[in-house]
A protein has these predicted regions:
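Catalytic-site neighborhood detector that most strongly recognizes the C-terminal catalytic loop/helix
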Residues: 68-72, 167-192
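Short basic/aromatic active-site micro-motif
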Residues: 131-151
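DNA breakage-rejoining catalytic core of tyrosine-based enzymes
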Residues: 1-19, 72-81, 100
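Active-site/catalytic core of tyrosine-dependent DNA strand-transfer enzymes
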Residues: 19, 82-132
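Basic, Lys/Arg- and aromatic-enriched nucleic-acid-binding interface segment
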Residues: 2, 13-43, 154-155
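Short pre-functional
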Residues: 34-46, 63-64, 146-151
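Active-site-proximal segment of tyrosine recombinases
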Residues: 49-50, 145, 153-169
Length: 195
């Protein structure tokens, strides 16, 4: 657990681990957190934007538009068929009060806070023995970024430019640092030396 007001950097999940976690959470009837992790990993949205989503925005559609809380910019998200199917499955199991309801509501009927989500994610990390040091809401966005980068490794500069735009970063250097690529490149330099 981190100290109050201290800063820790969220880590990303390996994509296959994230997908397995989404499936395990659903299998264990934890559809709310399964949906949270799926949306975070497949959209790259910040937690504040995920918590603001309502069912009518994401159910039975292949794309939706959000106005990002942090930047005020509009962003259109396309949902792939597997994610659409998972959203429908979660909707049927969660049984929200209506289509206008927020997607992530606590048992008390209020939208989860970021702090509560982070506590839940730490519990998930422990229960499912995730191999990740700092697992928080921001890990989902970083997992999205890392997967987009890894899928486009043959044209990594183009992938970084796309991610820079998606994340609303002012430079590719910021995106590289955000994804932890710079540190990895530095460490690989040491490995490339031979005796």
């Amino acid at each position: 657990m981190s100290l109050k007001y201290s800063s820790t950097t969220a880590d990303y999940l390996i994509w296959s681990d994230a997908m397995n976690l989404i499936r395990k959470l659903a299998k264990d009837d934890n559809y709310k957190i399964s949906l949270l992790i799926a949306l975070g990993c497949f959209t790259g949205l910040r937690i504040s934007d995920i918590l603001a989503l309502r069912w009518k925005q994401i159910i039975d559609t292949d794309e939706f538009t959000v106005t990002e809380k942090k930047t005020g910019k509009q962003r259109t998200i396309r949902l792939n068929p597997q994610l659409q199917e998972h959203i429908r499955e979660c909707y049927e199991h969660i049984k929200p009060v209506g289509i206008n309801a927020p997607i992530l509501v606590s048992q008390k009927g209020t939208v989860f806070s970021v702090q509560r989500i982070n506590i839940i994610l730490k519990e998930v990390k422990k229960k499912y023995r995730l191999k990740i040091k700092n697992f928080s809401c921001h890990s989902l966005r970083k997992t999205f970024g890392r997967q987009v980068y890894n899928m486009n490794s043959e044209n990594s500069e183009l992938a970084l430019v796309k991610l820079m735009e998606l994340f609303n970063h002012s430079s590719v250097a910021i995106t590289k640092r955000y994804l932890g690529l710079r540190q990895e490149e530095i460490l690989q330099t040491y490995e490339s030396l031979s005796f």
